[in-house]
Amino acid sequence: MSKFTEEELTYLKTQRIGRLATVNERGEPQIAPVGFRYNEELDTIDIGGHHLAESQKFRNITRNGLAAFVVDDVVPPWQPRCLEIRGQAQALSEGGESVLAQFSSALIRLTPKRIISWDTSTKRSHSARNV
């Protein structure tokens, strides 16, 4: 059983870009737009990119393994929607092509520990929970 609700999963599957937040060795935050996919088998968010293994975000994850990930958009007339996922992340040397064929082999895998969502479906709703 997934940690995500059906509405959250449906929303995730309609989005292509998210923002990954990590912290560097000086304790400074870094955020970057990234490509991703929901990994149904592991119930994780898998993040890929070009030259991912050489990136600051990959080094940050290798060092401390903490990350937050946000997917958001706005639908007319003005309805912001958002899914924030906080959790434990792994920097892996293989699997990036599963996100998008053009990506490098490196992969960041985020396992949710806290999920915050609002208005991810047609119903106006807000949810925050530890998972």
Name each region found by the language model:
Residues 16-50, 69:
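Short beta-strand segments
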Residues 36, 87-89, 112:
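A structural signal for short, well-ordered beta-strand segments
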Residues 1-19:
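Short, basic/aromatic recognition patches
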Residues 12, 60-61, 110:
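A generic structural signal for nonpolar/aromatic side chains embedded in well-ordered alpha-helices
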Residues 80, 93-131:
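C-terminal edge-of-domain segments
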Residues 51-105:
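Short, structured beta-strand-loop surface elements
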Residues 42-44, 66, 88, 114:
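Structural motif
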